[in-house]
Amino acid sequence: MSSQAKVLLVNGPNLNLLGRREPGHYGHHTLEQIVSDLQQQAADANLQLEHIQSNAEHLLIEAIHNTDADFVIINPAAFTHTSVALRDALLGVAIPFIEVHLSNVHSREPFRHHSYFSDKAVGIICGLGAQGYQFALQSVIAQLKASQQK
């Protein structure tokens, strides 16, 4: 990529507890480890990565409203199943996004099967643990390169 593109990484409620919260579902990586790995992957691709994690929906919405990112990677966590407001924020800024989930939401409780985001996402990655974030960023890098070649 010729100029430095920007990606906003959004992590929703309770993801600050990664590494100690239900490791059978979410793995042993902490959020700090995941973000650090992504920062390195982004730097290697000459990409700027901004990150926000919050348990407060309005802070995530404000971060999306205020970003000048070219792409969003979002793990809405529990907001996946409840937040029309967060969905509307993404649609309002019209920035493409990839939805990521550490666990396979479709093999869990029925209420986790519905997402307010999936029908608008460029792609969805679930059930691959922390590696899912890396795959999402790989996809973003490829899509940004392809858009610059047009």
UniProtKB/Swiss-Prot annotation:
It comes from the Bacteria. It catalyses: 3-dehydroquinate = 3-dehydroshikimate + H2O. InterPro entries: DHquinase_II (IPR001874), DHquinase_II_CS (IPR018509), DHquinase_II_sf (IPR036441). Disulfide bonds: none annotated. The keyword Lyase applies. GO terms for biological process: amino acid biosynthetic process; aromatic amino acid family biosynthetic process; chorismate biosynthetic process; quinate catabolic process. One of its GO terms (molecular function) is 3-dehydroquinate dehydratase activity. The keyword Ribonucleoprotein does not apply. The record marks R21 as: Transition state stabilizer. The active site is at Y26 (proton acceptor), H101 (proton donor). Its EC number is 4.2.1.10. Pathway: Metabolic intermediate biosynthesis; chorismate biosynthesis; chorismate from D-erythrose 4-phosphate and phosphoenolpyruvate: step 3/7. CDD domains: DHQase_II. Keywords: Amino-acid biosynthesis, Aromatic amino acid biosynthesis, Lyase. Substrate binds at N75, H81, D88, L102, S103, R112. Belongs to the type-II 3-dehydroquinase family. Catalyzes a trans-dehydration via an enolate intermediate. Homododecamer. This is 3-dehydroquinate dehydratase. The gene is aroQ.
